[in-house]
């Protein structure tokens, strides 16, 4: 493909992206010598600091994928599925506001029927789906999305006492950490590298990091030269 065609493709993709947030999509996925698989998802958002990256929630999967939908070579036959999705209104706006920024215990049921509690932090409501919340966990710092209002009312989510909701900062505020590269050392001594791409408005010490070659976003509390999370 000529450089001119590449430039045109990037320009067209950028223009299209502004119109597909909140839309359902389908595409094929081909990685290496693995068989081609088929996927359907909803586009939740664009990353404010890098609009070519999309927050994508695939059907039946709770973790959030962050992908360059129009330039990732593994994505084939990308289609926007009509019509645009209509989302339900939040029934308890007060509870929704109270959850954001809070540390919580989230109860899950294992395949064998036993229960386990995971400690996490509610980061934000999903902008286009207010009944869906971004959340991350101490044992797994990836970004997830769940319908937490239902879980709370069913007794499967509890706000941890003495952790008041954080005061949301302005989205216009800038932060010197955004755009910086970070180095992460695993328990086995190997390293991976990533970039700080976003500061969580409700928790100013919490940041999203996109590691090189990874299709997920990871959530860390950052202080100078330290990532305050359990190493994976």
UniProtKB/Swiss-Prot annotation:
Organism of provenance: Mus musculus
Cystine connections: none
Gene encoding the protein: Ssty1
PANTHER family: SPINDLIN
InterPro entries: SPIN/Ssty, SPIN/Ssty_sf
Name of the featured protein: Y-linked testis-specific protein 1
Coiled-coil ranges (or none): none
Biological-process GO terms, alphabetical: gamete generation
Tissue specificity comment: Expressed in testis (at protein level).
One Pfam entry name: Spin-Ssty
Assigned protein family: Belongs to the SPIN/STSY family.
């Amino acid at each position: 493909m000529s450089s001119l065609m590449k430039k045109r493709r990037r320009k067209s993709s950028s223009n299209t992206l502004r119109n597909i947030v909140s839309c359902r999509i389908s595409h094929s996925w081909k990685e290496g010598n693995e068989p081609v698989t088929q996927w359907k998802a909803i586009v939740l958002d664009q990353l404010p600091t890098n609009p070519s990256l999309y927050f994508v929630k695939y059907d039946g999967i709770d973790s959030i994928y962050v992908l360059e939908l129009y330039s990732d070579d593994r994505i084939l036959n990308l289609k926007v599925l009509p019509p645009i999705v209509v989302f339900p209104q939040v029934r308890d706006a007060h509870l929704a506001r109270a959850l954001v920024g809070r540390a919580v215990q989230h109860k899950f049921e294992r395949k064998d029927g036993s229960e386990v509690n995971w400690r996490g932090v509610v980061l934000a409501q999903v902008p286009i789906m207010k009944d869906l919340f971004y959340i991350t966990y101490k044992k797994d710092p990836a970004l997830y999305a769940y319908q937490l209002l239902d879980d709370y009312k069913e007794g499967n989510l509890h706000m941890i006492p003495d952790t008041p909701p954080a005061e949301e900062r302005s989205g216009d505020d800038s932060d010197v950490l955004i755009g910086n590269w970070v180095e992460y050392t695993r328990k086995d001594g190997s390293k991976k590298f990533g970039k700080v791409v976003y500061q969580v408005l409700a928790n100013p010490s919490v940041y999203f990091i996109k590691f090189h070659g990874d299709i997920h976003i990871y959530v860390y509390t950052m202080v100078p030269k330290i990532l305050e999370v359990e190493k994976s």
